[in-house]
């Protein structure tokens, strides 16, 4: 059985530099390798599903307030994440002590400058210091015996705050 390493970086309101067009600043790029949206209904042969596994649990996690502080090569299979924290998934960053909770009943907590998302907000805004937080997650897992013979295997994310990329075994496989 192969061991798979699943990684994803979550980019909130993301851009890495104002001069470069990134996927999250291009309104024509809403996804890469994503299946069409649909209801999450999965038939099972038995009460305990034999065609899905849950990856909820403890993941390795690293949070940064700005993209420039992220680790760009964190997705490589030989990357050492021993200094990263153990983080529950699913979970909210702010509830777990990373970043500042933002509640806006009207308006936006960031500078409106489409398609750029890193414009400097007002000094009093929370996003002035946490311009574009990035969460990086890592987890290793094994597919059950026989799954590779099935052909395709799908990942389903049931809640992500904003844009994210997914890597498996060091290879970028998607963006949403």
Kindly label every feature range from the protein language model.
Residues 1-21:
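Bacterial Sec-dependent N-terminal signal peptides
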Residues 11, 52, 77, 146-148, ...:
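Generic structural signal for beta-strand residues in well-ordered domains
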Residues 18-118, 173:
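Accessory carbohydrate-binding/adhesion or oligomerization-edge regions at the termini
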Residues 22-31, 35, 46, 60-64, ...:
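Accessory beta-strand-rich segments of carbohydrate-active enzymes
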